[in-house]
Amino acid sequence: MARYLGPKAKLSRREGTDLFLKSARRSISDKAKFDSKPGQHGRTSGTRTSDYGLQLREKQKVKRMYGVLEKQFRRYFEEADRRRGNTGANLLSVLESRLDNVVYRMGFGSTRAEARQLVSHKAMTVNGQSVNIPSYMVKAGDVIAVRDKSKKQTRIAEALELAKQVGLPAWVDVNADKGEGTFKKVPDRDEFAADINESLIVELYSR
């Protein structure tokens, strides 16, 4: 499955919720009527979706939200299933620990896609070492920083300004002036993404 490169608002409308694929400074809230499906007049939603359909849609929503393709998503689920505790919550913990997501959460990228690009282009370091793998798993206590030669990028400054306005999550500690932040801990399930029903994904993969 290739990575989707089309209109971001269309994906959010398809899932019926904001996937945060576009920067808040270019909000899609006015353009994407989340209760209206893509199409000239939107698809009717009078027919009842099957349990399988609901499970599949939830998986697609989370994959798109975090920018992960099927093969890798399946590996994350298998890793989550091996861990102790709730498999669904474990899955979200794995996704939240991806380097591109942490860069986004720290405000260095205004979207996960922009954060992924920063990582791929070697603009970020982890504990002083250059890492260009978006799926790199960040651990509690790791320090994520913008490389010196990348600190003058306008998009990073704009993203940090936006993050300053909307606030940062409690599990990261960021020094915007230094261009670095600490991943304090993997967030608890009740700290993020209330619009995700991970139990549907567990049910899907357990079929």
UniProtKB/Swiss-Prot annotation:
Region (Disordered): 29-54
Residue stretches of biased makeup (Basic and acidic residues): 29-38
GO molecular-function term, one example from the UniProt record: structural constituent of ribosome
Biased composition (Polar residues): 42-52
Family assignment from sequence similarity: Belongs to the universal ribosomal protein uS4 family.
Function summary: One of the primary rRNA binding proteins, it binds directly to 16S rRNA where it nucleates assembly of the body of the 30S subunit. With S5 and S12 plays an important role in translational accuracy.
HAMAP family, per the entry: Ribosomal_uS4_B
Protein name (Swiss-Prot/TrEMBL): Small ribosomal subunit protein uS4
Gene coding for it: rpsD
